[in-house]
Design a protein with these regions (language model features):
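Catalytic-core regions of core metabolic enzymes
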Residues: 1-266
Length: 266
């Protein structure tokens, strides 16, 4: 069993005809994911990698293929509209891989999604993978993962890969690995993922990786105190980061005492 996506998930790629979209659609399909559709306005009727059909709109793709999860690979200026289009078409789960979306756009998106049933993962995230279910909905390297019973949730994509690589190297497999993204405004939170892992009978423990910026780690700590009953290992990175300097992610910046690594570790 996995959380968020499983072997029955029907994946759609918005921006599938672009270089990154087509490349990762192929890798996801090769891993075992059920990639059923792509969307690029003006290119409907074509086929792309693995003979996946391309549609002009998300609505057309959903109607024709039953796609129920979308990965967004469109350029940052158009990513917010792509998220809203997928939500309007009734897609229940969206993982926005795109990086560099204007904060003003995400303010509108987050507000818009509050009144919907859509789950947004990201933006600026690697997506998710379940080695148990052989489903990859994102950009993480599939070969480093091993089926098992440890969940992983992280703000950082590359640190997720590092943690997973070490777990696999020690013979410890993973149930589901979720990258929630490093932007200041995002959808699914640490708490959301921890709640799902808590309810998942096939996850025995969790590795959580946080970083400087914001207060999501502190919020998760408060949740864990009262509601999380499984073993949890937490890594907070950025202890040497200088205040006011962005460290990779748009949200990885110390703007106050609570955003510092040492405060999160407390």
């Amino acid at each position: 069993m996995s959380i968020i996506a499983d072997r029955n998930t029907r994946l759609m790629f918005q921006g599938i005809t672009g270089k990154e979209g087509s490349y990762h659609a192929r890798l996801c399909a090769e891993y075992g994911s059920n990639v059923v559709a792509g969307v690029t306005p003006g290119k409907g009727g074509q086929t792309t990698v693995q003979d996946v059909p391309v549609f002009d709109t998300v609505g057309q793709a959903v109607e024709a293929t039953g796609a129920n999860m979308s990965l967004i690979f469109v350029p940052p200026p158009f990513a917010a509209d792509a998220i809203v289009e997928a939500s309007d078409a009734g897609v229940p789960t969206i993982a926005c891989i795109a990086e560099g979306i204007p904060v003003s756009d995400m303010v509108k998106v987050v507000h818009y999604l509050e009144g919907t049933e859509t789950r947004l993962i990201g933006p600026n995230c690697p997506g998710l993978i379940s080695p148990v279910e052989k489903v990859k909905a994102g950009i993480m390297p599939g070969h480093i993962h091993k089926p098992g019973r440890i969940g992983v949730v992280s703000r950082s994509g590359t640190l997720t890969y590092e943690a997973v690589g070490q777990l696999t190297g020690m013979g410890i497999g993973q149930s589901t690995c979720v990258g929630i993204g490093g932007d200041p405004l995002s959808g699914t939170s640490f708490i959301d993922v921890l709640e799902m892992f808590e309810s998942d009978p096939d996850t025995d423990g969790v590795v959580m990786i946080g970083e400087i910026g914001g207060s999501r780690e502190q919020d998760a700590a408060e949740y864990v105190k009262e509601h999380f009953n499984k073993p949890l290992a937490v890594l907070i990175v950025g202890q040497s980061a200088p205040p006011g300097r962005r460290m990779g992610h748009a949200g990885a910046i110390i703007t106050g005492r609570a955003a510092r690594a040492e405060e999160k570790i407390k």
